Amino acid sequence: MDGQKSSNSISPRDLYEKLGTAQAPILIDVRKPADFAASDRCIVAAFHRAPDDIARWSKELPAGRPVVVHCVRGGQTSQTAAAALAAAGHDAAYLEGGITAWSEAGLPTRRKLAVATGKWVTRERPKIDRIACPWLISRFIDPNAQFIYVPDARVLAVAKETGAIPYDVKGVEYTHEGERCSFDTIVRIHDIHDPALDRLATIVRGADTSRHDLAEQCGGLFAISLGLSANFADDHAMLKHGMVMYDALYTWCRSLQAETHNWPATKPLPQAAV
């Protein structure tokens, strides 16, 4: 097998190209408890599970979605976990080189912060930041997060009642800071470094704070967001469609900025009737 790539492995770069969208695999950190505790970083969107308890937690994984597991260096721990998941019927692979190779490649990690109940609450009738933030949380922090929309006056009370994290309201941790919006604050607190996400953050900031000069895409995001809000009375229905929009915008920020689109030069224009 020298020089050959394992059929059940994935490179850091190939995994990165899948992240940030609904097509991303479930990403599970199977570092041994001591290794996990010794580090203050984790790969974005990954959640930790004990490698010696696979028989239990594998039953909780949704059917039909690919799974990628990683350990420190892509060695026996993650390879054994991937094999066990495959034997249980999952489409499983391990990350080549583990979180070490991922980090050395400059790919995005986040600060390892506990996220309370996994619930987040904000004001109803979202437009930009309150759709962009759930996308960011779901795609980069907690893929199992739940989002609650309530009247402005009820946000803090509902947060206290449910243990949900309040965001994009005055006086809380996850909110606007100066000229930066709540999306920026989440990126800062969780210490996520990703050039594509930085580009997207600029677009969101410009659209959310009426500074469309920050990036030429700001005005387009503003227009589409207001149009979505006008078309959906149900905030969660709007969020569902907004997730697709931000998946597409993030993909463009990451991989498609060099793409162009124009009328094919080789295609003759129709001739006007004489």
Where do the language-model regions lie?
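Flexible, polar/low-complexity N-terminal or interdomain linker segments that lie immediately upstream
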Residues: 1-38, 110-133, 139, 262-268
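Short loop/helix-cap segments at secondary-structure boundaries that form the rim of catalytic
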Residues: 37-44, 157-161
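Short, structured coil segments at secondary-structure junctions
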Residues: 42-44, 88, 143
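Short acidic-hydrophobic, aromatic-tinged amphipathic segments that line or gate anion-handling sites
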Residues: 49-50
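Gly/Ser/Thr-rich loops at beta-strand to alpha-helix junctions
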Residues: 73-77, 126-127, 154
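Extended, well-folded catalytic/binding cores that form a central cleft or groove in large enzyme
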Residues: 117-125, 132-268
